[in-house]
A protein has these predicted regions:
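Short beta-strand/loop segment at the start of cytosolic alpha/beta domains
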Residues: 1-15
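Amphipathic alpha-helical interaction surfaces in cytosolic regulatory modules
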Residues: 19-96
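Short acidic-hydrophobic, aromatic-tinged amphipathic segments that line or gate anion-handling sites
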Residues: 98-100
Length: 100
């Protein structure tokens, strides 16, 4: 799992690449905590190269969304693959995020 973070002004883009399984989620906690610090603005999670997401990965997304809500920011999830979109639909996460 690779996460590339780029900030310009109040917009932060995090490009996720690979599988966000349980182990990768544990290894990505620090990067998601860094995103929470930037959650006053807009955080875009670019999922165009995200192949898989586990419940641990979903927890990271949800924690980031809660931080953004608290700080008056927002999280946008962008370019979900069909397989990852199905996970979001089954778990009800389609109702929790703004999608592009």
């Amino acid at each position: 799992m690779e996460i590339n973070i780029n900030t310009q002004g109040k917009e932060t883009v995090a490009a996720l690449c690979g599988r966000l399984d349980t182990l990768a989620a544990q290894e990505s906690v620090a990067q998601f905590e860094a995103l929470q610090e930037k959650a006053r603005g807009t955080v875009i999670l670019d999922c165009s190269k995200l192949e898989y997401i586990s419940s641990s990965g979903l927890r990271l997304f949800l924690t980031l969304r809660k931080a953004a809500d608290t700080k008056g920011g927002k999280v946008i999830v962008k370019d979900l693959s069909a397989d990852v979109r199905k996970v979001f639909m089954i778990t009800g996460f389609m109702n929790l995020f703004e999608f592009q």
